[in-house]
């Protein structure tokens, strides 16, 4: 029973949800319960509605109509009443970048270099400090905008290992929304919810998508399964190419930089192939491959005579492919050089995301101290000319012989309102939502007509583009993923990277970590493997090439002109080059050898097995076909560890990258992976 008061609908219950639209609007709320619906309507001043979780039942949805004269911008908040946090048990799981798990709850402001922590906003109130761009102030929660790199999925959960609270938006059109989280350290409670931003012209309607808030029994994996069941009801994962079975990471090379400096011309692709294979890669991808180099002249990409021209490029691609390498190429999925191309002058100027004041949404990229950089408009994915150009450049790349096409930035961008009606949407519509998804679906549909194995890449993952994009370059502010996975052992860490959340929800997902230094340490290679991440390996500058080819440590001034230098230059030592290179290749070969499990298997995280022993052990499970199960264990400690693995199948073997098959009872050496293989898995 819902009781109406002057400005709210209130109840008495331990858990509730509140909706707070702002502005003079007419609204309605549909509350589901036991298959029936109750519709509540009202109009007037800002207000709040409180409804018990018992009343919600399956979920709710809503409708807002602007009856004001003129347009209004407003937000519609849906949030659960504060959920109790049990110190030492409760963890908050957020779909941030790779996935975030928050386990340690703060009592005061804490900062620690290299570790994502909480940010105090006012007395006893904290928000997760998810990025250096988090500018939350006062009591406003830190927004995680979906769909984007900051909120890759429409769900989150608070769980104590036995039960949890599930928050999800079941919105098949992937409309703009923010996941909001606030922690009150005095009450020891966390508040979770959604905000739906909107721009409503007079007389128009906004439909609030279905929101689910419910308590459940089980671990965080139960919440992941609930979300995946809904996702499967309205979407599907794109066909993955056969090359996915060998994909342990990719060797990315910027052939020509923004300032015109050439690091690797087309005529020297043979040595590029040597370096890629020596590091264990079967996939290469080229940035800065056109006349303009990297971060200029977008979206025009023409083979560069200075690097050898079209003939040399086509021949070089064929030679790489003859050696078993899969070759892909770069474009930017949203940037267009402002006034710098024929494209912009003829069509691009009318494709930009346009603000309410008529100014365009833009970015300025400057890579070198001796170069002015370039300004780009952000293109609207609804604009017909932009959509046509994104398909055209992909078709052009396929004609050159490329097997995959990389759209930079396309997965990371968060929704923004665009006011240019020439794009086919109403003024103020939030773009980078369903329009991004359909643009990429149109591209992959055309590409796979002639080559079913053609694959699209994206920088950054979000689940709206899983039906078109096969490979993802991760985006984690260029930090070392192996180190961050190991961060879960660092005392006092509030937030740790938790890729298990994302990969358990979408075990088909193929995504790399992110690192801007031309090396991969042993720790990083192991951390990526156990977390189901592939390895991102980037060669950006001439000094990078010298290091990956022959171990020549960079001179002190090698990166002097560069504004954003590689983050781990100090590790680029001649004496460790060969060991790092060879170990990365060893782990890559190991993952391919057991690829039916570790690369093509279904990622199950920590489900259905237990591990005892060791102080710093991370272990995850994969199920292959034909009843095979693999449990990969990483001893992240600097000393050997005695470890035992319990699983309900028949033990087959234990194997390590360097030593091959080993006795399962042997100590696992320091910073070493071990795969325990079983047969006839139990149903879970």
Please report, for each region that a protein language model flagged, where it lies by residue.
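Bacterial N-terminal signal peptides that target proteins for export
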Residues: 1-10
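Hydrophobic h-region of N-terminal signal peptides that target proteins for export
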Residues: 13-21
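Polysaccharide-binding surfaces and accessory modules of carbohydrate-active proteins
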Residues: 27-42, 47-179
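Active-site-proximal substrate-binding groove within the catalytic cores of carbohydrate-active enzymes
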Residues: 31, 203-204, 208, 435-657, ...
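Conserved structural scaffold segments of CAZyme catalytic domains across common CAZy folds
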Residues: 71-74, 121-328, 332-343, 576, ...
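Active-site-adjacent "subsite" loops/lids of carbohydrate-active enzymes
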Residues: 261-264, 312-313, 318, 328-400, ...
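Aromatic- and acidic-residue-enriched carbohydrate-binding clefts of CAZyme catalytic domains
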Residues: 290-313, 342-381, 413-438, 443
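Active-site neighborhood of glycoside hydrolase catalytic domains
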Residues: 377-469, 480-485
